[in-house]
UniProtKB/Swiss-Prot annotation:
SMART domains: RING. Residues 368-379 have a biased composition (Pro residues). It is an enzyme of class 2 (transferase). Its EC number is 2.3.2.27. A zinc finger (RING-type) spans 126-167. Residues 1-121, 221-312, 325-683, 803-825 are annotated as: Disordered. The gene is RL2. Residues 658-667 have a biased composition (Basic residues). This is E3 ubiquitin-protein ligase ICP0. SUPFAM superfamilies: RING/U-box (SSF57850).
């Protein structure tokens, strides 16, 4: 009777024992077959040991290639016993199952099994499981050579890569040792302590499997090194937090998981479906619900999962799904209707769809996480705010008090669906409304009131709109209160306010156009500023000209935060050029508009270096008008001074360049035409060479490290690993010459300059700074002394002799003009 090959790791070794006494078989082959059965029985116990680590037994035996079965069986059949014979694998792993005779032959036969038993020293006890080690499962840890079971070490090493007996770091496991001296290895990967030995085992081609230490989520399926590829015989089991489930959990964070479970569980089966993997199963619920309403597949699934009839669940799901697309479009009545539908079905399903509808508008509008405090939101909310504010401001039309109340209500309509903090947006208009009603003296309060939130105006463009409207109201109060000290406060307010209402509407409508132009390019911003400039032929439009300067303040603040000192000063040439012209036109019209335009021109011209004369003249005119105007004139000059401080960085706002968020982080000071870079900080910089480091620079340009392959790796001589990189700066150094000789194509491909601008020049010292040199800590390698980036000298260990290459005689510094050939700027 022929023995049946082991087709599963749970095979009972009892029925296969009798063929050992069969006289027709070879003497040692039944013994090898019995060892295979023992190995499979131990493999099943190994899976139970791994269950203690945190892996369920069902997950390990979900398919035919289990954790222990695939490891031990494939290692046993891949060549540990006999590499020449074809391996015999279970039918689930191979298409054709070998015959029993082939299965016995694949086990290696009697002589090979005896050799392994003799070479392995049978009778050893594993220190982990305290059982006798079967010869096919025997392994020895390197370098301590302690014997263990392979399944035990595959469980132990990922948790702690040390020998269980002597606590020595294990580089690899030695398996399949024969009497002839051949063996195989299982390297331990991802341990920096034993990386060299493990990689050497893979390069030698003896590795038949590998063990990954550390986080099992990052374990690869295979690894290649030295032309050899090693596949993991036992892949990482599906842990509770795999990458696929992490993606599902990320989606759950984006939209809460409770609404997705609601269509699938009714009133009775809520607790039964909670323990399953809900995120992966319920993620397609929202897009799949409309298809289920037409085809009838998902309602059946919902009824089965809930334990109740499918009809009520469908009746509860379909109205909510029908109302979801309008809610995603931005409506709120649909969201409330979704909540009512969920409340109506509360007896069978919890009102879980309501949070999804409540979160739809912010997700659709903001379209990402909340914007950065230094990056304004998109132009969509701003255009919506400006259109509504233009209608509200032009609606009241006549009196000043209705207009101010309209301005106070403007941010509320825009802030409710868009901004998280409405009180900040509405604070400035409310104060300006009280300033309109109080008279000429209180306008000193709105100046500070709208100046305080100025530091937060770049957080959202709605705040910018509210503050601009607040400044417009304060400007109306100041424009009416300045000359009102002489001619009475009531009459100028009645004459100026009706004309100011249309201009407030025009200014509110022009702000989004200007911001969109500034975002699109400098040309659009200049056209917007030029379109705002011709609005000042009459007296009330001097106020509009004054509002043109504060309108650039939000961009100036954000531009200053993003660009720093790199923004060109010529970007602000257009606003100061428009300010003197408006100043001349307004000065010919009335004294009040002259004072306001002079304040605006002084604030705009002080922010540009090219219009300093206009700044001084406008500042003198503003001081003269404030002294002549009395209290109202002093308020106007104070507000002009406040806006001068706010718009002192304004010229950079007209030409934003690229993402402002990263400009400051990537900026660096370069030596060259900048006057500040020519004078570094004085003093000697001491560079001590690193002793005991043997490294070489490999002449292999890395194209993926730099654009043109100007990056060379620095290799450690002991391990061959890349420890650092060298980036070339020009084509004249010794490293560049060697690289050009080794790789001629590099000189044609590189974009490096012929000579670097910040090249090292010889020192210019009248006498050697012996006092500084004597204070150096001297090493046998020698010190290199630099002064402001210039090599001063390298010191010998036995004396203070300068050895820099530009010395004419030993120990004497080179003169100033003795620069090396080819290094002149």
């Amino acid at each position: 009777m022929e023995p049946r090959p082991g087709t599963s790791s749970r095979a009972d070794p009892g029925p296969e024992r009798p063929p050992r006494q069969t006289p027709g078989t070879q003497p040692a082959a039944p013994h090898a077959w019995g060892m295979l059965n023992d190995m499979q029985w131990l493999a099943s116990s190994d899976s139970e040991e791994e269950t203690e680590v945190g892996i369920s037994d069902d997950d390990l035996h979900r398919d035919s290639t289990s954790e222990a079965g695939s490891t031990d069986t494939e290692m046993f059949e891949a060549g540990l016993m006999d590499a020449a014979t074809p391996p015999a694998r279970p039918p689930a792993e191979r298409q054709g199952s070998p015959t029993p005779a082939d299965a016995q032959g694949s086990c290696g036969g009697g002589p090979v099994g005896e050799e392994e038993a003799e070479a392995g020293g049978g009778g050893d006890v594993c220190a982990v499981c305290t059982d006798e080690i079967a010869p096919p499962l025997r392994c020895q840890s390197f370098p301590c050579l302690h014997p263990f079971c392979i399944p035990c070490m595959k469980t132990w090493i990922p948790l702690r890569n040390t020998c269980p007996l002597c606590n020595t770091p294990v580089a690899y496991l030695i398996v399949g040792v024969t009497a002839s001296g051949s063996f195989s290895t299982i390297p331990i990967v991802n341990d920096p302590r034993t990386r060299v030995e493990a990689e050497a085992a893979v390069r030698a081609g003896t590795a038949v499997d590998f063990i990954w230490t550390g986080n099992p989520r990052t374990a690869p399926r295979s690894l290649s090194l030295g032309g050899h590829t090693v596949r993991a015989l036992s892949p990482t089991p599906p842990w509770p937090g795999t990458d696929d489930e992490d993606d599902d959990l990320a989606d759950v964070d984006y939209v809460p998981p409770a609404p997705r479970r609601a269509p699938r569980r009714g009133g009775g089966g809520a607790g039964a479906t909670r323990g399953t993997s809900q995120p992966a199963a319920t993620r397609p619920a929202p897009p799949g619900a409309p298809r289920s309403s037409s085809s009838g597949g998902a309602p059946l699934r919902a009824g089965v999962g809930s334990g109740s009839g499918g009809g009520p669940a469908v009746a509860a799901v379909v109205p909510r799904v029908a109302s979801l697309p309008p809610a995603a479009g931005g409506g709120r009545a649909q969201a409330r209707r979704v909540g009512e539908d969920a409340a109506a079905a509360e007896g069978r399903t919890p009102p879980a769809r309501q949070p999804r509808a409540a979160q739809e508008p912010p997700i659709v509008i903001s379209d990402s996480p909340p914007p950065s405090p230094r990056r304004p939101a998109g132009p969509g909310p701003l255009s919506f705010v400006s259109s509504s504010s233009a209608q509200v401001s032009s609606g009241p039309g006549g009196g000043g008090l209705p207009q101010s109340s309209g301005r106070a209500a403007r941010p509320r309509a825009a802030v409710a669906p868009r901004v998280r903090s409405p009180p900040r947006a509405a604070a400035a208009p409310v104060v300006s409304a009280s300033a309109d009603a109080a008279g000429p003296a209180p306008p000193a309060v709105p100046v500070d009131a709208h100046r305080a939130p100025r530091s937060r105006m770049t957080q959202a463009q709605t705040d910018t709109q509210a503050q601009s409207l607040g400044r417009a109201g304060a400007t109306d109060a100041r424009g009416s209160g300045g000359p009102g000290a002489e001619g009475g406060p009531g009459v100028p307010r009645g004459t100026n306010t009706p004309g100011a209402a249309p201009h407030a509407a025009e200014g509110a409508a022009a702000r989004p156009r200007k911001r969109r132009g500034s975002d699109s390019g400098p040309a659009a911003s200049s056209s917007a500023s030029s379109s705002a400039a011709p609005r000042s032929p009459l007296a009330p439009q001097g106020v509009g000209a004054k509002r043109a300067a504060p309108r650039r303040a939000p961009d100036s603040d954000s531009g200053d935060r993003g660009h720093g000192p790199l923004a060109p000063a010529s970007a602000g040439a257009a606003p100061p050029s428009a300010s003197p012209s408006s100043q001349a036109a307004v000065a010919a019209a009335s004294s009040s508009s002259a004072s306001s335009s002079s304040a605006s021109s002084s604030s705009a011209s002080s922010s540009s270096a090219s219009s300093s004369s206009a700044s001084s003249s406008s500042a003198s005119s503003s001081s003269a008008s404030s002294s002549a105007g009395g209290a109202g004139g002093s308020v106007a000059s104070a507000s002009g001074a406040g806006e001068r401080r706010e718009t002192s960085l304004g010229p950079r706002a007209a030409a934003p360049r690229g993402p402002r968020k990263c400009a400051r982080k990537t900026r660096h000071a370069e030596g060259g035409p900048e006057p500040g870079a020519r004078d570094p900080a004085p003093g000697l910089t001491r560079y001590l060479p690193i002793a005991g480091v043997s490294s070489v620079v490999a002449l292999a340009p890395y194209v993926n490290k730099t654009v043109t392959g100007d990056c060379l790796p620095v290799l450690d001589m002991e391990t061959g690993h890349i420890g650092a990189y060298v980036v070339l700066v020009d084509q004249t150094g010794n490293v560049a010459d060697l690289l050009r000789a080794a790789a001629p194509a590099w000189s044609r491909r590189t974009l490096l300059p012929e000579h670097a601008r910040n090249c090292v020049r010889p020192p210019d010292y009248p006498t050697p700074p012996a006092s500084e040199w004597n204070s150096l800590w001297m090493t046998p390698v020698g010190n290199m002394l630099f002064d402001q980036g210039t090599l001063v000298g390298a010191l010998d260990f036995h004396g203070l002799r300068s050895r820099h290459p530009w010395s004419r005689e030993q120990g004497a510094p080179a003169p100033a003009g003795d620069a090396p050939a080819g290094h002149g700027e």
